[in-house]
A protein has these predicted regions:
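Walker A (P-loop) phosphate-binding loop of P-loop NTPases
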Residues: 3
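Conserved lysine of the Walker
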Residues: 6
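Hydrophobic positions on the alpha1 helix immediately C-terminal to the Walker A/P-loop
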Residues: 9, 13
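N-terminal phosphate/diphosphate-binding loop that engages ATP/GTP or pyrophosphate donors
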Residues: 15-64, 71
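Switch II (G3) loop of P-loop NTPases
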Residues: 56-61, 80-96
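Conserved catalytic-core segment of NTP-binding enzymes
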Residues: 91-198
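N-terminal regions of ATP-driven nucleic-acid and macromolecular assemblies
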Residues: 192-221
Length: 221
């Protein structure tokens, strides 16, 4: 994506968990800005893996939210498998998450901040801490960890990944949060010497193609 890349991370993490968890997870689209994950192709692919996909069905996110929230609450409260929420990092996303805050037991959830050091507002320690504190206040929930996901779309290289890793470590020390994992496109990770990288790695397979990137006709089959 054009922002932190959290939708790609959410989808790839959900697919990974579907392969290792005894009960496939559910994924919830609470991102108001990025509609790509609502595409029929992405939804069909995840459902074929046994993943429950919970998305707004109408054209207006805010009108759909009151209908969506009971379904999300039901998935969380059922205790049947993990539930991954893809939440926008803006004020609307934080408010949507805040409307669910009473569903999560205080120690029964992980809230992970996806950090991209190449984005405005999260390019340095002060910016990251400010953004995260604002989200926590609005969402009425606390972050429990960080994901290093620095990228520049197609221009990402190992240097960008290391930059993001070091920033995430710095933020983690300041806010007393662990680094859950580093995520990056598989082809960039293959170029990277990971010696000294002290965290798990989630390779990303890009699934959120923009409409203009999708091939059509016989050559795209």
């Amino acid at each position: 994506g054009f922002g932190s890349g959290k939708t790609e991370v959410s989808v790839n993490l959900t697919k990974y968990l579907a392969g290792i968890d005894p009960i496939p997870p559910a994924i919830v689209d609470l991102d108001l800005v990025n509609p790509y994950f609502r595409s029929r192709e992405a939804e069909a692919e995840m459902e074929a893996m046994g993943i429950k996909v919970i998305v707004p069905r109408g054209g207006n996110f805010f009108a759909d939210l009151p209908i969506l929230l009971p379904e999300v609450k039901g998935a969380v409260e059922s205790g049947a498998g993990r539930v991954i929420l893809d939440v926008g990092g803006d004020s609307q996303g934080a408010r949507a998450l805040g409307s669910l805050s009473d569903v999560f037991p205080p120690d029964g959830y992980d809230m992970l901040m996806v950090l991209n050091s190449r984005r405005p507002f999260t390019g340095d320690l002060a910016g990251c801490c400010k953004v995260m504190s604002r989200i926590e206040a609005t969402a009425k929930m606390r972050f429990t960890g960080l994901i290093a996901n620095s990228h520049m779309i197609e221009e990402t290289d190992p240097e960008v990944l290391w930059e993001g890793y070091h920033l995430a470590r710095e933020v983690g020390r300041e806010m007393n949060l662990p680094l859950a994992f580093l995520s990056a496109k598989r082809e960039v990770l293959e170029q990277m010497d990971t010696t000294g990288l002290n965290c798990p790695i989630l390779p990303l397979t890009r699934s959120m193609l923009k409409p203009w990137e999708k091939k059509t006709g016989p050559t795209g089959l």
